[in-house]
Regions:
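A generic structural signal for short beta-strands and their flanking turns/coil linkers
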Residues: 31-33, 43-45, 86-88
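Intrinsically disordered, low-complexity Pro/Gly/Ser/Thr-rich segments with frequent PxxP/GP/PP motifs
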Residues: 54-89
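Surface-exposed, flexible loop/turn segments at secondary-structure boundaries
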Residues: 43, 57, 98
Length: 118
């Protein structure tokens, strides 16, 4: 098994529909340690955060975050993590496109050794 630490940055680029912000790769479990959202809009925005379970093809609402204009919020508080299995997704939705930026820090645990690291 290989452990890969990653930072993932993504813009919530659609309004009123779910956007896949991160998907755990094939044969990989992902442990999301931190998620920071920043609102670049002139007004406050609400962001709905969901976890998609690939095994059951079901979205589970995780949190609705209210973010003031030009401010950020941490989605995960002390000792909270999100564990995603292969194919699971972190999804977000906001009424306004291109105003929410996400940075997530995570650990990917591969079930097999990557060929570029052998």
């Amino acid at each position: 098994m290989a452990n890969i630490y990653k930072n993932v940055q993504k813009l919530l680029n659609a309004a009123g529909s779910d956007v896949d912000m991160y998907e755990s790769p094939t044969a990989t479990a992902s442990i999301i340690k931190t998620v920071k959202l920043f609102n670049t809009h002139s007004g406050a925005l609400d962001v709905t955060v969901k976890v998609f379970d690939a095994t059951t093809s079901t979205d589970f609402e995780y949190k609705v975050a209210s973010i003031n204009a030009n401010e950020g919020v941490d989605l995960l508080t002390f000792n909270n993590i999100i564990v995603l299995e292969a194919g699971d997704k972190l999804k977000m939705q906001c009424a306004t496109a291109d105003k929410i930026k996400m940075t997530a820090s995570l650990l990917q645990i591969l079930r097999t050794q990557p060929t570029d690291q052998i």
